């Protein structure tokens, strides 16, 4: 693009700001009825933020649902703090000798944001929720692919630096098992 000679370093600088932008985008759902859950909250003590949020249903009555947007905003704020810490203290340190120094903050953002979306998107139920099929959303599929990309990237780096190890196989088996477990849980819900 010609913006910089080192794109990975530029993405490292943008990653904490990107996470903070996601926080504000999620908090903007407070002013509309999007990003609410299927879970109805009937306990009056829990019918306020951070757990519940009121929406008006088609009959004109107010019902309280799990505030997915607020929980996502809190989780992404935690990711922002973690990325800022990592950016200011460890960004120039390679993960291991022989690994690249730049790009790790951006990979962490991609992985953590995808994990939050993969987890929380299953609770959403609104007009902007895009189904891929009857039980898995497009956002969940894209999040799983992003986590897979990070897994491939770091597996290649680790294989190059450490050689072939048993924990690579264990890590891949763990990814496949958690992906299968997530799919089964989504299907059963």
Please describe what each predicted stretch is:
Residues 1-189:
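A feature for loop-to-transmembrane-helix boundaries and adjacent hydrophobic helices
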């Amino acid at each position: 693009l010609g913006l910089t000679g080192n794109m990975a370093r530029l993405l490292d600088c943008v990653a904490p700001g990107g996470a903070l932008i996601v926080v504000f985008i999620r908090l903007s759902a407070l002013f509309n009825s999007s990003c609410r859950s299927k879970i109805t909250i009937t306990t009056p003590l829990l019918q306020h933020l951070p757990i519940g949020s009121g929406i008006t249903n088609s009959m004109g009555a107010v019902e309280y649902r799990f505030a997915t947007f607020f929980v996502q905003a809190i989780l992404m704020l935690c990711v922002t703090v973690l990325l800022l810490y990592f950016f200011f203290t460890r960004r120039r340190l390679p993960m291991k000798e022989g690994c690249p120094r730049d790009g790790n903050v951006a990979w962490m953002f991609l992985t953590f944001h995808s994990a939050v979306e993969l987890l929380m998107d299953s609770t959403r139920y609104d007009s902007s929720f895009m189904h891929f099929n009857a039980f898995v959303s497009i956002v969940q599929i894209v999040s799983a692919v992003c986590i897979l990309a990070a897994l491939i990237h770091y597996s290649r780096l680790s294989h190059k630096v450490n050689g072939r190890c048993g924990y690579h196989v264990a890590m891949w088996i763990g990814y496949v098992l958690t992906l299968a477990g997530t799919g089964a849980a989504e299907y059963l819900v």
